[in-house]
Amino acid sequence: METVNKKELIVSKIKNGTVIDHIPAGRALAVLRILKIAEGYRIALVMNVESKKMGKKDIVKIENKEVDEKEANLITLIAPTATINIIRDYEVVEKKKLKIPDIVKGLLKCTNLMCITNNDVEAIPGFKKISEKPLKMKCVYCDTVIDENEILKQILGSKS
């Protein structure tokens, strides 16, 4: 947890929920959009705090919500350096270091209108990672490449 000095926490600990740490600076609000947080959740956002590894980072704490696998996969695409910590009774019971998978299925859409995934309801879109920095993924059906900007646009603009 980030500290103001060695004894004072910026944000208090949570009893149960999720802490998403090591989010690239400026991406915390995008993470919240992915999680579709409704009224009633207590949330703490810490943005642009110092990080030895990253220079600056964001942190998101959400009480009484555990991030599921689909949400974690979407977060990975916009915050590949993030770590998801599941908290129960003030203790970290699970820690997941996110990593962009080699293949992503069903989370992104191909931008090629002629791709079979845009014309056949049974064809599930799939993308193969071709680079991480910058993030680029290639459609496994038609070889169309989408970049990080397109991925962000799809994830943050999605209504699913």
From Swiss-Prot:
Select a single GO molecular function from the record's annotations and give it. metal ion binding
Q: Which domain of life is it from?
A: Archaea
User: A GO CC term?
Assistant: aspartate carbamoyltransferase complex
Q: Which cofactor does it need?
A: Zn(2+)
Enumerate the Pfam families for this protein: PyrI, PyrI_C
Q: Is the keyword Metal-binding in the record? A: yes
Q: Does the keyword Metal-binding apply?
A: yes
The processes (GO biological process) annotated in the record are: 'de novo' pyrimidine nucleobase biosynthetic process; pyrimidine nucleotide biosynthetic process
Q: HAMAP family attached here?
A: Asp_carb_tr_reg
Report the sequence similarity comment from the record: Belongs to the PyrI family.
Name the record gives this protein: Aspartate carbamoyltransferase regulatory chain
* Species, as recorded: Sulfurisphaera tokodaii (strain DSM 16993 / JCM 10545 / NBRC 100140 / 7)
